[in-house]
């Protein structure tokens, strides 16, 4: 027994490069990661049993409170590959500038398994009859099985008969996949010299497409989980295009009170297929008095478009907050 849920991780990483010439080198990276995790816990099952139910010995509505084990398992595989070319221009107006162009593919595939209680089958076995097959509207057709909700072994130890377990409990399996395709390129170098140093610049572009497909298990998608939230399939994609630039300008250096004073400015334009376009910027000033003392100030803007999960989230079920139904805390 352990208080910490077990997690097993395995990773493989490889990278390499090949020099084509003094000004060009191709490179590549590959990453594979697999994670397996599991959680073992306990939960309660506490349905209201109708007074006329054959398992109810009290002659009026009563609640059976049962503690049962419940487990979850997850397996996640992540794969990423990058291929690019980098180097330095050796002639023309970009002489001395560095370049980098690359493509990337990333995939994440997950399987998650949850122990669940059939909601429709609980409803079928807690009414006026031992088992009402008409109430099994989602997980059927199945042979109706009555449940002895007030059996001493069930109440005290959570042990149902094998037939009752097979009827009430199952494992719901969901799958989630994310993919990303990315293309990017950048140039960096010095524009010209100032008395305090060279003005450095970077320009770049990037385009990427992200997609998600989260498919919960059948019972989760159909709201057939007793005592648990559920959700439908979340599926969709988005394409993003970006262009950016950044300047580093040395203003002053090596004068009394100023070892180095530098201005930095950056600008980024972003266009989401789902959201539209917007731009952000940042300006900063870096004042180094001496080696051990520096003062920085910055101002910038930002924005965030909806993530895929937020953009394509399907309908969900949940629970009413306790504060809205419990008069003792209202």
What are these language model-derived features?
Residues 123, 243-245, 249, 279-287:
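Feature captures outer-membrane beta-barrel proteins of Gram-negative bacteria and organelles
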Residues 187, 246-250, 264-269, 279:
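Active-site-adjacent structural elements in folded domains
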Residues 261-273, 297-299:
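Transmembrane beta-strand segments that form the barrel wall of outer-membrane beta-barrel proteins
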Residues 278-284, 296, 309-311:
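Short beta-alpha junctions and helix-cap segments that line functional grooves
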Residues 270-272, 288, 302-308:
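Short, conserved secondary-structure transition motifs
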Residues 237, 270-279:
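Solvent-exposed loop/turn segments connecting transmembrane beta-strands
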Residues 1-8, 13, 17-241, 254-256, ...:
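Surface-exposed, low-complexity loop segments enriched in small/polar and acidic residues
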């Amino acid at each position: 027994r352990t208080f910490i849920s077990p997690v097993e991780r395995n990773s493989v990483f490889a990278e390499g490069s090949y020099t084509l010439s003094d000004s060009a080198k191709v490179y590549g990276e590959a990453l594979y990661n697999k994670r397996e995790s599991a959680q073992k816990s306990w939960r309660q099952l506490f349905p209201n049993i109708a007074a006329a139910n054959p398992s109810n010995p009290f002659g009026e509505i009563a609640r059976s409170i049962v503690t049962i084990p419940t487990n979850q398992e997850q397996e996640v595989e992540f794969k990423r590959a990058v291929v690019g070319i980098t180097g330095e221009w050796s002639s023309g107006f970009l002489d001395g500038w560095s370049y980098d162009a690359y493509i990337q593919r990333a995939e994440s595939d997950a399987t998650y398994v949850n122990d669940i209680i059939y909601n429709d089958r609980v409803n079928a076995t807690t009414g006026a009859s031992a088992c009402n097959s008409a109430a099994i509207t989602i997980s059927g057709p199945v042979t109706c099985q009555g449940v002895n909700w007030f059996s001493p072994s069930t109440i005290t130890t959570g042990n149902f008969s094998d037939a009752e377990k097979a009827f009430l409990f199952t494992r719901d399996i969901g799958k989630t996949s994310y993919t990303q395709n990315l293309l990017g390129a950048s140039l960096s170098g010095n524009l010209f010299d100032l008395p305090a140093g060279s003005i450095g610049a970077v320009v770049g572009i990037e385009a990427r497409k992200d997609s998600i497909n989260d498919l919960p298990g059948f019972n989760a998608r159909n709201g057939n989980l007793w005592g648990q939230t559920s959700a439908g399939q979340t599926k969709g994609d988005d394409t993003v295009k970006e262009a950016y630039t950044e300047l580093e300008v040395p203003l002053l250096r090596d004068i009394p009170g100023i070892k180095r004073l530098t201005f930095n400015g950056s600008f980024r334009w972003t266009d989401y297929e789902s959201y539209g376009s917007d731009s952000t910027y940042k300006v900063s000033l870096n004042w180094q008095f001496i080696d051990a003392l520096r003062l920085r100030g910055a101002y910038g803007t930002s924005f965030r478009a909806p993530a895929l999960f937020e953009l394509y989230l399907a309908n969900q079920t949940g629970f009413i907050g306790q504060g809205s139904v419990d008069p003792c805390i209202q």
